[in-house]
Amino acid sequence: MASLMEVRDMLALQGRMEAKQLSARLQTPQPLIDAMLERMEAMGKVVRISETSEGCLSGSCKSCPEGKAACRQEWWALR
């Protein structure tokens, strides 16, 4: 189980990471990492960076069951 300080240190070393990357690196369940990141965001320690992939050439996102959410990446970085 990782602490808030370990999450902060990992972000400091890596620059920016996705929650699933943090979860794998720290060997901590992703729901716990998500909760920690949201708490750190509320404290003003980290910032959420959302990127939408504009490279969907086929336009199949409309028919995809996951929709545009599958093309969206969410990164976390220290403030």
UniProtKB/Swiss-Prot annotation:
SUPFAM superfamilies: Winged helix' DNA-binding domain
Keywords: DNA-binding, Iron, Iron-sulfur, Metal-binding, Repressor, Transcription, Transcription regulation
Amino-acid positions noted as binding iron-sulfur cluster in the UniProt annotation, renumbered to this chain: C56, C61, C64, C71
UniProt GO MF annotations: DNA binding; iron ion binding; iron-sulfur cluster binding
Listed Gene3D superfamilies: Winged helix-like DNA-binding domain superfamily/Winged helix DNA-binding domain
InterPro entries associated with the record: FeoC, Tscrpt_reg_HTH_FeoC, WH-like_DNA-bd_sf, WH_DNA-bd_sf
Superkingdom of origin: Bacteria
First and last residue of the signal peptide: none
Function: May function as a transcriptional regulator that controls feoABC expression.
Protein family per UniProt: Belongs to the FeoC family.
Protein's name in the database: Probable [Fe-S]-dependent transcriptional repressor
Organism encoding this protein: Klebsiella pneumoniae subsp. pneumoniae (strain ATCC 700721 / MGH 78578)
Lineage: Bacteria, Pseudomonadati, Pseudomonadota, Gammaproteobacteria, Enterobacterales
